[in-house]
Amino acid sequence: MPRPASESWSPIQSRIPAYKAVSHLRLLPTANSPSGSNQPTNPNRAQHPEGPQSREGATSPVLASLEPPTPTDLPSARARPRVPAESGPGWLHKARRPTRGILRDVLRHRGVPAQPRPAPGAHQLSSPSS
């Protein structure tokens, strides 16, 4: 039996079974269902005791009075400024880098010349301050 031209119909709708099209919806309350049930028709919609309001009005006054802390109030921001090389995508949270040993010349500033290292055992022979 052909469908009337006034009814909107597409070939995609004809391939979807009717039980799959409405399987995610809950049945609406009918005349024989008890009227005292507070079950919402949409399971994803929460029912609030104060009724539908805007989200600004739903905030408690205690939470509304608190302001989010500024980044300078946080102790990690006051510790030291971030170096641009440390803020890249490959930088991980590492422990404090060592400043003793062979890495001292690597970590020094570019403008400061490197101090020559004494030979092994030279501190036993003479002091460098004389």
UniProtKB/Swiss-Prot annotation:
Residues 23-130 are annotated as: Disordered. It comes from the Eukaryota. This is Putative uncharacterized protein ST20-AS1. It comes from Homo sapiens. Residues 30-45 have a biased composition (Polar residues).
